[in-house]
């Protein structure tokens, strides 16, 4: 690929908090060399959208890769000049003086292959046909994403990350980095994640995919040519997923059994506030997300299982890691329960690998990793202080 210029944030066009990274501008990185995929096929001439925050130091030792979860993107922090409301999905974590302090670290966010936020994916034009890939876009895996991310690191001249960090699906990518490129990261930070999906989690994903596949507007994944979008299926898929991201405690506090109107109407329309909330979330998601991308990413979640190649033995799988680990879970997260994080911790301890573990008592379920709970952020801040001291940042 062509040489990469290290971008700087665009000048602020409006007032922002002093701990914001400011107005940011993504860059499109093009890779001509084919990327061999786990399924045996290859993809060539692909693009990845990238955002960076902070300054890469002279020896390029202060870089941190932030891996995104299902519906997120490269836009980790800051705002865009033409859309102040589009705040980065982890803006409370990344910025000057924040836990991942951009005064000390150079932070990279990458939109994964197959996504719908600018990187090559099902919505992109297939050079072989001149039409969108649609259903023809190859199935990708967490491992494929990590290989693509490694090429981004190469383009920036980064031989070793100070840390690779992610929550949920992003945490799986961080684990994969520690296994596939063990000498290219000093620290691996895994938050609200799991070393593999349970049968229940795969089942949730299957129900969500079925909602999309059964939408009459899906057209076998080639709905772009029909000028439609399977919004009904996407809406239901998001509603299913959103239920799993919240805890029972959080839902009870937010909604309880509160009615949308004063009286019961004895109908199948929205009666309860929680129904209204789910429909709102589903409608919003269906407007901006792509159905084929949803299928791809949930399948990548399903396939991730580093222990599979080792007879199901996670301890054997993690033996090749060299990084120090921070693993964090949330007590009310039932999507990726603390017990799943402890499986990873045990495998690391069995291999005598350095690992710190924290289970945070937060009421917000799986989505707690996106929120700014003081205990959680203090943990992250302390760990990054340690990394900064190690590398002299």
UniProtKB/Swiss-Prot annotation:
It comes from Cupriavidus taiwanensis (strain DSM 17343 / BCRC 17206 / CCUG 44338 / CIP 107171 / LMG 19424 / R1) (Ralstonia taiwanensis (strain LMG 19424)). Transfers a succinyl group from succinyl-CoA to L-homoserine, forming succinyl-L-homoserine. Homodimer. Residues 62-372 form the AB hydrolase-1 domain. GO terms for cellular component: cytoplasm. It is found in: Cytoplasm. Pathway: Amino-acid biosynthesis; L-methionine biosynthesis via de novo pathway; O-succinyl-L-homoserine from L-homoserine: step 1/1. It comes from the Bacteria. The active site is at 168 (nucleophile), 333, 366. Belongs to the AB hydrolase superfamily. MetX family. Pfam families: Abhydrolase_1. Its EC number is 2.3.1.46. The keyword Acyltransferase applies. This is Homoserine O-succinyltransferase. Its main location: cytoplasm. One of its GO terms (molecular function) is homoserine O-acetyltransferase activity. The record marks 335 as: Important for acyl-CoA specificity. Keywords: Acyltransferase, Amino-acid biosynthesis, Cytoplasm, Methionine biosynthesis, Transferase.
